[in-house]
């Protein structure tokens, strides 16, 4: 049974790109985006819960987030969780609604976030290269077991390399676009 599976490699590489896009969406760019609050967890009902499971998040204005807490008892913990999340956001409590004005970013903060976007991209590139290495190793094992010929192995290795190059180009494009967005 051949170990090489091109569809599996494509799926895993695509997963690395999707993970990067999710990470980049969470970086604050000066514009309101509900994904900013994805990493926020709130201590309620005796456990940590993601904010989006105890409140609805909307973007009423370009520089304002709105968090509608469903249970009035959770307003305090939600306020505390957002303030302590390290996002630089200070909620204004209005009943069960929290308004989060998005402050202007300093040039220093923009550079930090740009650097972080680069780190996320590098993490995704490493993941893609690891998938590539797994694919190449599987091809060599298949050839050693005489399941594929040397010519087939070389042809598949070329396919894997093309897939890797295309995926890394996609990662670079996403990271570059995000860095431009952050730096203004």
UniProtKB/Swiss-Prot annotation:
UniProt KW Cytoplasm keyword: yes
CDD domains referenced in this protein's UniProt entry, alphabetically: RRF
GO biological process, one term: cytoplasmic translational termination
InterPro entries named in the record: Ribosome_recyc_fac, Ribosome_recyc_fac_dom, RRF_sf
Transmembrane segments: none
Biased composition (Basic and acidic residues): 133-162
Disulfide bonds listed in the record: none
Superkingdom to which the source organism belongs: Bacteria
GO molecular function: ribosomal large subunit binding
Any one of the GO CC terms: cytosol
Region (Disordered): 133-163
Keyword Signal: no
Keyword terms, alphabetized: Cytoplasm, Protein biosynthesis
Location of this chain's protein in the cell: Cytoplasm
Entry's family note: Belongs to the RRF family.
Function: Responsible for the release of ribosomes from messenger RNA at the termination of protein biosynthesis. May increase the efficiency of translation by recycling ribosomes from one round of translation to another.
Stored NCBIfam families: frr (TIGR00496)
HAMAP family: RRF
Name of this chain's protein: Ribosome-recycling factor
Organism annotation: Sphingopyxis alaskensis (strain DSM 13593 / LMG 18877 / RB2256) (Sphingomonas alaskensis)
């Amino acid at each position: 049974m051949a170990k090489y599976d091109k569809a599996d490699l494509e799926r895993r590489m695509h997963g690395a790109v999707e993970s990067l896009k999710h990470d980049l969406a969470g970086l604050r760019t000066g514009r309101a985006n509900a994904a900013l609050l994805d990493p926020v967890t709130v201590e309620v009902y005796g456990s940590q819960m993601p904010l989006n499971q105890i409140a609805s998040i909307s973007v009423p204005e370009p520089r304002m987030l709105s968090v509608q807490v469903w249970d009035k008892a959770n307003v305090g913990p939600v306020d505390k969780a957002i303030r302590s999340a390290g996002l630089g956001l200070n909620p204004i409590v209005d009943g069960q609604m929290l308004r989060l004005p998005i402050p202007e970013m300093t040039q220093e903060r923009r550079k930090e976030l740009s650097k972080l976007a680069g780190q996320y991209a590098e993490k995704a590139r490493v993941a893609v290269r690891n998938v590539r290495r797994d694919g190449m190793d599987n091809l060599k094992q298949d050839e050693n077991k005489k399941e594929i010929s040397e010519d087939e192995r070389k042809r598949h290795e070329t396919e894997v390399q093309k897939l890797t190059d295309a995926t890394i180009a996609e990662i670079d494009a996403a990271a570059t676009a995000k860095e431009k967005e952050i730096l203004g």
